[in-house]
Structure formats: C-alpha cells, structure tokens
Regions:
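Short amphipathic helical patch at the helix-1/turn junction of helix-turn-helix
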Residues: 33, 67-68
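Short glycine/proline-centered loop/turn elements that form peptide/ligand docking sites
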Residues: 47, 69-73, 90-95
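Conserved catalytic-core motifs of GNAT/GCN5-like acyltransferases
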Residues: 22, 63-65, 83-99, 115
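Acetyl-CoA-dependent GNAT
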Residues: 1-40, 44-57, 86, 104-105, ...
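Long, intrinsically disordered low-complexity tandem-repeat segments
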Residues: 106-116
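Conserved active-site tyrosine of GNAT-family acetyltransferases
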Residues: 77, 82, 101
Length: 119
C-alpha cells in the first residue's frame, strides 16, 4: 500500500511524494512539484519527511527508479545521498532505461536527525 506526502502553500497543494514500504525498504514511487514552485526546496522537504518518517518506523534502505535521461532528477537524488546501483533496461513504456538508486540506513538516519534538529 502506497502512502502520499503532500506539500502545501497556504491551502494549495504544490507537490507530492508517493512511497511504498516493503519490509524494511521504502520505495519512492513518484515525486512531483508544481513547475512554478521548483528549485525552492519542496522536493527536498518531501523526501526528507519520507525518510524521517520511514526510518522512525524501521526502514533500513530507500530505493527509487529515475529515467536515465533525466539529468536534473539524477543530480537531485545524488545530492540527497542516493547512489546509482543498477539499471533497469526498457523500464518505461517508451523503452527508456531507468537507473536504480538507493540510500542506506546510515544516511537515512543522519538525514532524519538533521531534519529533527532544524524543525
């Protein structure tokens, strides 16, 4: 069962992150931010909230797939501690490959502690 985290500004939704927990792993399924709200930390805040919440309930690893051609998203995830560990050939409907990226528990715990201190 997937869970949804939503970022709001005033009463308006400006972004979301969907993730699914399987055993001790959290799988980031989708991240979207209103184009007018990009580069303002919305995706970073959503990702930090997911990692904090899931680490607190026992997640040890996070993983996601990202389009091989999506250079901006790949850089974003790398900057948040995710590491490319593999490739899923022809993963997307158009035949494009996906990069598999993961983040381990040590980094997730560190990020959760930093988020707790800054709130």
């Amino acid at each position: 069962e997937a869970r949804l985290w939503v970022a709001k500004e005033e009463a308006r939704s400006i972004g979301f992150l969907a993730a699914r927990r399987i055993a001790d792993e959290v799988h980031v399924l989708s991240v979207a931010v209103d184009p007018e709200q990009r580069r303002r930390g919305v995706a970073s805040s959503l990702l930090a909230a997911v990692l904090r919440d899931e680490t607190a309930s026992g997640a040890r690893t996070a993983l996601l797939e990202v389009r091989a051609s999506n250079v901006a998203a790949r850089a974003f995830y790398a900057n948040t501690g995710f590491v490319a560990v593999g490739r899923r050939s022809r993963y997307y409907a158009n035949g494009e490959d996906a990069l598999l990226m993961t983040k381990d528990a040590l980094l997730m715990t560190k990020d959760a502690l930093l988020m707790t201190r800054s709130t």
